[in-house]
Amino acid sequence: MSDILDKIIAVKREEIAQAIKRKPLAVVREDAESRVLTRDFVGALRAKISAGKPAVIAEVKKASPSKGVLRADFIPADIAQSYAEHGAACLSVLTDRQFFQGSVDYLKQARASCALPVLRKDFMVDAYQVYEARVMGADCILLIVACLDDAQMKALEALAFSLDMAVLVEVHDEAELERALKLRTPLVGINNRNLKTFEVSLDNTLSLLGKVPADRLLVTESGISTPADVKRLREARVNAFLVGEAFMRAEDPGVALAQLFGLD
């Protein structure tokens, strides 16, 4: 595991400990189990692909550790609405505060402003966070293979499924992909960022593509910023994309989405 992930996970453990003091696990579990129906995250992606369109998970992201603030004029509801109007299949909302300046409130605001299913983008290491995700309205959670052992992944996936949430499992290399494929979720995200060097290359997705079984839905993540990138990936039969930074820097994120994917 990289140093940055070690640091992030330590912070998450402390955040969870503090959250449990404010709201005990039994309470958050009861809240999660009493929530209304989720939106179909996997179904939304498959519907776009069946229609011959790219399935875009559009990210609502204020900042990143490496780039700082991406968007000063940051209004999650407006961003989400624009994404929905311009062809996004789903949303991804950062809820990590310390490293990405995210917020639970951002997810709530984004989800309330449109009908799209929403991924809680955070570093999930504990069951408490899964219950929390359901309470805030998430329809899907992210499990990062680099942050978890196999038993943890399996347990968190089972809990998410029991709460009617989808799971996107994220990998960075072939060894992580092999571990991810032990899970039941159809959603496999390949992150194009090298966790050791932080360099980004679409070759990461293209090199692992053939090792993803046909019954899984591959989502390529990071480094997709030009129509040429999209063309290259779509020609390789990659149909689902998670994109944030390229949109966050644009005047209108939804318009930028339509332009990048040829949906305008």
From Swiss-Prot:
Pathway membership, UniProt: Amino-acid biosynthesis; L-tryptophan biosynthesis; L-tryptophan from chorismate: step 4/5
Signal sequence region: none
Catalytic activity, EC: 4.1.1.48
GO terms for MF: indole-3-glycerol-phosphate synthase activity; phosphoribosylanthranilate isomerase activity
GO biological process, one term: L-tryptophan biosynthetic process
Matches recorded under Gene3D superfamilies: Aldolase class I
Record keywords, A-Z: Amino-acid biosynthesis, Aromatic amino acid biosynthesis, Decarboxylase, Lyase, Tryptophan biosynthesis
Keyword Membrane tagged: no
Swiss-Prot/TrEMBL catalytic activity: 1-(2-carboxyphenylamino)-1-deoxy-D-ribulose 5-phosphate + H(+) = (1S,2R)-1-C-(indol-3-yl)glycerol 3-phosphate + CO2 + H2O
Broad class of enzyme this protein falls into: lyase
Pfam (any one): IGPS
PANTHER family registered for this protein in UniProt: INDOLE-3-GLYCEROL-PHOSPHATE SYNTHASE (PTHR22854:SF2), TRYPTOPHAN BIOSYNTHESIS PROTEIN (PTHR22854)
Family according to the record: Belongs to the TrpC family.
Name assigned to this protein: Indole-3-glycerol phosphate synthase
